[in-house]
Amino acid sequence: LTCVKSNSIWFITSENCPAGQNLCFKRWQYISPRMYDFTR
């Protein structure tokens, strides 16, 4: 499973997140829906 994490608004990193995929994606989508769709 892939989880999207961000240290800042302009820097995006993807990491394996088997335990908290849903939480991580929901948090990222909440921060920036457009960037979330872009990373898909």
From Swiss-Prot:
The keyword Secreted appears for this protein: yes
SUPFAM superfamilies documented for this protein: Snake toxin-like
GO MF term set: toxin activity
Disulphide linkage map: 3-24
Keywords: Disulfide bond, G-protein coupled acetylcholine receptor impairing toxin, G-protein coupled receptor impairing toxin, Neurotoxin, Postsynaptic neurotoxin, Secreted, Toxin
Pfam family, one: Toxin_cobra-type
Top-level taxon in the UniProt lineage: Eukaryota
Compartments it resides in: Secreted
Known tissue expression: Expressed by the venom gland.
Primary residence: secreted
Post-translational modification: Contains 4 disulfide bonds.
One GO cellular component term noted in the UniProt record for this chain: extracellular region
Purpose: Binds irreversibly and specifically to M1 (CHRM1) muscarinic acetylcholine receptors, blocking further binding of antagonists and preventing the action of agonists.
Family: Belongs to the three-finger toxin family. Short-chain subfamily. Aminergic toxin sub-subfamily.
Protein name (record): Muscarinic m1-toxin4
Organism: Dendroaspis angusticeps
Lineage of the organism: Eukaryota, Metazoa, Chordata, Craniata, Vertebrata
